[in-house]
């Protein structure tokens, strides 16, 4: 088996930049789903601190697949039937798709806000504060809404409710320039994630909701040093704590014509995860030694020790 890490970096503010304020705007359009994405970025740079702000607004329509079907599976990926049901509309029967190449119920929209501050502390130390927020519209599950039962669709509704994510992560970068600690970073992180799964079958008025409220805490310390003879050492510790609270319930739709005019009282159903809450925690430490033996050879050896805990009820 192969292992690896995909490490994403977000843009960072600049201190003492050549321009005090710099902004840019980009927009993208995709014809396959009539999607439009707009992004506005503003940078501010001063003598002792910098800021970068990014706002993205995206809206995507239903995906249209290619019409040339040379793979031999003539009906694969086509959408002959679809559901017009939503939070606020009610249709007792599946609808016929006038263009089967359009994958109905694949469109959604999303807003993303990204803010970073970089603050100089003293002569060498830096404080980086990373703040992110994102929220989506309802996101339909195309695969579930395509399942058939006795010649018709099984589900009239199956979608993720608006997904919300908030993150704040301050990171202190230090440069003590000592023998066993030339530089290091101490990073705290907190995320709050809300998601839900809502579904209802055709010929049924009960709409089920499964709602998750997840909180994630993390604390990392990473340090390294190097020596003149080609040797370098990196070491650190990490602690994480994840807590999820789940709830689930059914509600009966109150309808008038094709409109959902109200919802009945909630009654409990099985939750997706333990209903009294569940948590996962970990603590880990690592040590890595690297030796650049020559221009062509590098020797690495490392060790990591991890403790984990799981609690659910």
Where are the regions that the model predicts?
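Solvent-exposed coil/turn segments that connect beta secondary-structure elements
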Residues: 11-13, 30, 58, 240
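Face-selective signature of the C-terminal outer-membrane beta-barrel domain
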Residues: 120-134, 162-313
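Solvent-exposed loop segments that connect transmembrane elements
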Residues: 67-100, 143-157, 200-207, 249-273, ...
């Amino acid at each position: 088996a192969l292992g690896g890490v995909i490490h994403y970096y977000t843009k960072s503010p600049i201190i003492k930049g050549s321009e005090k304020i710099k902004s840019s705007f980009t927009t993208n359009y995709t014809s396959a789903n009539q999607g439009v994405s707009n992004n506005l970025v503003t940078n501010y740079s001063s003598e002792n601190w910098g800021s970068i702000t990014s706002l993205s607004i995206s809206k995507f329509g239903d995906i249209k697949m290619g019409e040339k079907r040379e793979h031999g599976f003539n009906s694969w990926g086509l959408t002959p039937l679809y559901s017009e049901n939503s939070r606020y509309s009610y249709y007792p029967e599946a609808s016929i798709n006038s263009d089967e190449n359009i994958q109905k119920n694949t469109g959604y929209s999303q807003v993303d806000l990204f803010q970073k501050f970089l603050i100089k502390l003293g002569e060498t130390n830096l404080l980086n504060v990373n703040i992110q927020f994102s929220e989506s519209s309802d996101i339909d599950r195309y695969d579930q809404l395509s399942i058939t039962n006795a010649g018709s669709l099984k589900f009239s509704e199956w979608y993720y409710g608006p997904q919300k994510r908030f993150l704040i992560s301050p990171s202190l970068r230090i440069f003590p320039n000592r023998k066993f600690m030339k530089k290091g970073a101490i990073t705290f992180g907190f995320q709050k994630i809300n998601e839900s799964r809502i579904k209802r079958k055709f010929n049924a008025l009960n709409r089920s909701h499964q709602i998750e409220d997840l909180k994630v805490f993390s604390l990392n310390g990473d340090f390294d040093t190097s020596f003149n003879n080609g040797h370098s050492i990196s070491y650190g510790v990490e602690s994480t704590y994840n807590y999820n609270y789940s709830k689930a319930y059914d509600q009966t739709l109150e309808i008038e014509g094709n409109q959902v005019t109200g919802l009945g009282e909630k009654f409990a159903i099985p939750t997706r995860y333990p209903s009294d809450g569940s948590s996962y925690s970990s603590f880990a430490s690592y040590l890595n030694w690297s030796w650049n033996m020559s221009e062509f050879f590098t020797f690495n050896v490392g060790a990591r020790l991890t403790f984990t805990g799981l609690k659910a009820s």
